[in-house]
Swiss-Prot record:
Originating species: Caenorhabditis elegans
Listed Pfam families: PK_Tyr_Ser-Thr (PF07714), SH3_9 (PF14604)
Record's catalysed reaction(s): L-seryl-[protein] + ATP = O-phospho-L-seryl-[protein] + ADP + H(+); L-threonyl-[protein] + ATP = O-phospho-L-threonyl-[protein] + ADP + H(+)
Bias kind Polar residues: ranges: 623-633, 690-699, 774-790, 798-808
Activity regulation (UniProt): Activated by phosphorylation at Ser-355. May be activated by svh-2-mediated phosphorylation.
Subunit (UniProt): Interacts with max-2; the interaction is independent of max-2 and mlk-1 kinase activities. May interact (via NPQY motif when phosphorylated on tyrosine residue) with shc-1 (via PID domain); the interaction may facilitate mek-1 phosphorylation by bringing mlk-1 and mek-1 together. Interacts with svh-2 (via cytoplasmic domain). Interacts with tpa-1.
UniProtKB keywords: ATP-binding, Coiled coil, Kinase, Magnesium, Metal-binding, Nucleotide-binding, Phosphoprotein, Serine/threonine-protein kinase, SH3 domain, Stress response, Transferase, Ubl conjugation
Protein name in UniProt: Mitogen-activated protein kinase kinase kinase mlk-1
Gene3D superfamilies: SH3 Domains, Transferase(Phosphotransferase) domain 1
SH3 domain location: 69-130
Coiled coil: 199-224
Amino acid sequence: MEQASVPSYVNIPPIAKTRSTSHLAPTPEHHRSVSYEDTTTASTSTDSVPEVRIRSESSQVSRESPPIRASKAFVASYEYEAQKDDELNLPLGAIITLVTVETNEDGWYRGELNGKVGLFPSNYAREVTYKDNLVEFKQDEIMLPVAVRTLSDCQIGHGATATVFKMDIKIKKELQNGRMGEAVGDQMKAALKRFNRHASNFRADVVSTDEQLEQLKREANLVNGLSHNNIVRLLGICLEDPYFGLLLELCEGSSLRNVCRNLNSDAAIPLGVLIDWATQVAEGMEYLTKQGYVHRDLKADNVLVKEEVCLCMDEEMFQYAYCLKCGKRPFDKLQLKITDFGVTRKMTADANRFSTAGTYAWLAPEAFKEGTWSEASDVWSYGVVLWELLTREEPYQGHIPATIAFQIANKGQNLSIGDSCPDRWKKLMQDCWNLEPNFRPKFSTLAISFKQYAKEFKDTHLQRAPSKMAVKELYSECFADKTKEEFEKRFHDLYAGSGDINRKNRHSIAPETKARRLKHHKPKKADITGPTEVKHILSVQKDDKNFRVKTYDQSSTGGTLPRLNERQSTLSLSSPDLFHISNLISGSNTVGHSAHRISRKNAIRHKKNQHRMFESPVVSPTMDDSNTFSTIDNADEVDPNHSKESKKGGTLSRAWAKLPWNKRDSKEDHDERAVAGSISSRSSSTTSSNRLITGQTTRGASAAGLLEIGARSRAQSTADGWEDPNTTKKHKVSPSDKRPVKTTNQTERYVKDLEKDTPLRPAQLPPTHRKSALDQTIPASPNSPDSINNFHPMPLSSRRTTANSSSDGAPCYDALVSHSYGAGHGHKNHFGLSDTIPLFPEEPTHYDMGPGRPFGTNGRAIVNQGGDYYGNISGQNYEGFGHGRSINQSTQYYPVGGGCDDYIPIVQKTVIKPTVGEVGNSPYSENIRCATRNVQNPQYIQCKKNQNPRRIPALPMKIQSESNLVTSGMVFTPRDEQLNGIGNSLSSLSLNEPPDIPAPLPPVVTYPIPASLISPSNRVSMSPPTRMAPVLPLGAMSSPRIMDKEILKNSSVEGTEIY
């Protein structure tokens, strides 16, 4: 071997344990198969080779120190294709010289093949000892028998692939000690199986002489070394013409099939003899299975008889070793040999014996359909051999063979031979024909069973005649014409689609290749080093992120937590800001720095730019006195059954309460409000269904009255809240109240998600939102026309309404109003929570309603059309505080929902002019404007349309006083947005039917107005309608856009200072 062929490294692991060779024996026709035990647990073929693990460099040694060679050889039992450069390609039957078993790869040996040294899987090769080395014979060492002149005269068998001759061979040293048979002098008898070159059993039809020689050697190595009394042994090979072939152990008694068929039909073979024959075949197959062989063509024709058979059938001769009449062996003394496995396999065999019908008779269904063989498939064939021995018939002769076997297997009976057949024999055959391969017995079990069977029937001599008669009856029953078509159909269903049998396409199950993993062996003392010095290694990294920590930075506009890299905060932000919070203890109304600050745990914390679920981005003011929370006398009742329901769903409720936003609402809001005495309009009014719609009406000329409504409503609600603390409250009045709130779909939480984009805000506003107290004065925008003179304040009933929701989803504040006479007239125009609200001396007692007029498609009233329409004020001469109108001017009432049954007037266009510089980018259309909408902080203008209006039911609003009648005329034009109320997509009420909601009588309220200004002409007498059917024309414009248009046209409106 050349030095260059040695790999650059050799791994030296501990000695690998001895590999079991029970699964390494060769398989016929270029392939091997594992034992039956392996096939039931593993089905990995050589086509899916596991990933090979690369060895570490620490296990490599220098090429200058080659390993010590071992004097052993291995024969490749399976074909293996190298997966790495340091591995060997293993052709089937190749002889591998073992280099060493000491590799660092578990299950891998190092060997030499064709001058190359490399690794090979140990379970793909079988060890060959010195005595099993293949013996080669020369041409002159093979001789014809004495009385034979030509080779054809000594022919004893012929097949499509090979011809068998009876020859004399010279005894060699390796064949001494009588291992192969009787020897006469220096010669012994042998069978020469010479292959036909034109139809050889190799992979190609035409191969070169060198290739034939090499393949013959490899395939001879597969069966070499097998030694068993029931296995035909290989004596050697001859590589020279005319004796090119294999030299096998000679069996002069022909095949077991011929023995059974040559007997007289009237002669019966004793059952004890049949049991002995079945035992020998089972023991021979058990040995092959342990050596890793799968026969794949087991039948009576491939079971040979060692000696010539006595056909005298004289039972008296059974007590002798040889027949006294013919000198041959009696039946009970025959030695059976299994042959025709390995390379001697015939591709087609004789035409009559290896036809399609003959093959199906012994072939297991799974082997034919799937093309894989195992011990279980040989067991199936063994059952057919038992049937041959008992019946001495060709199985399924004249018919498709596997049909009967399959049909009887489905019924639980396979080739039953009648009541006269021993039940034990019958059961053994049926077990071999189990359709499930895993349920078939093994050959070792069969051998033991027949040995026990032989002991039981040692003295029993059952004749064959009764059994033969039962078999004949079986044939006549099974092959009747009426059932033949059914049997053929069953056979077609079993074997159809598998194609013709082709042994070149057959393959056996190869063992799984072990992954090349490094062995972990126990370390030696020399490998253990002494103690080393202990070192503490610290990793220091330069800060390139400009990390800094802010500690109580009062110049910061954000929260109080440190920020990394000056990023936008994703943490929580204090609200109120701990750096900009008023002195709550001293009761200051101004926002600024104070020596007294609340603790951080009492502050409301909100995610910056990450609003909580159903949370409005605009929060109500949070600063007021400690008496902020109050009961609402006419709020919706809490469902008395809710407590029972919450008990049933307690697990879900508790889980929902543990969510982050719920925790903050229940704990942090409660702590902050309890200490600071603050309140949000959302938490104090969500229980009420009496709501006013919100919008931009707080910024126009008609907004003053509605702004006053909010202040009066808040004050009224607060005053109503003083009650006995021991009285059980039925409504939620503060965040600390743990009772459930009856929510509606029109709350600010619900409509928050409808605003996808941040609304536009007017100029000159603070960069960030600052919370304001309920009683704190919020200055108007420089361009705001909120200051209105000559507008009488409009009172509202004590029913609390939600002041922070709007029909278009716009967030808003509660009313912050001015006096009807303007700034500085009369009294403080925003009452405090503790102020006494004076009453007006007079109040209207009834309403007079008159016929109205419908609206056209352009929003203008239709004249000269008959019919009365509900919601129209009768034409009376009225002069109110504000702009005048004609005596016959009628006002269309438009329903606005929000939880109360109020209406607002819609009047025709007259004289309102906007202040110069008023909002110039207002997107609202022209022509008409609703008289009132709900309150909104005048610092903000909601300019974004609601892109996703929701269908929210609402009730109309009733008029409480004649001061509600705004005298400005307006014209109604289309707008894309929707208003809550009857006749729009947000209302569940119909336009065609008047609502059954009567307007309740207004409350008694005293107005603080000079008596000189009050006259009978300033009042309008109306009767409350019983049914009102307001009409919103198609394509009409919503009220906020109408009002904005009127504001822009009113040049006489001046700014208002709000206290």
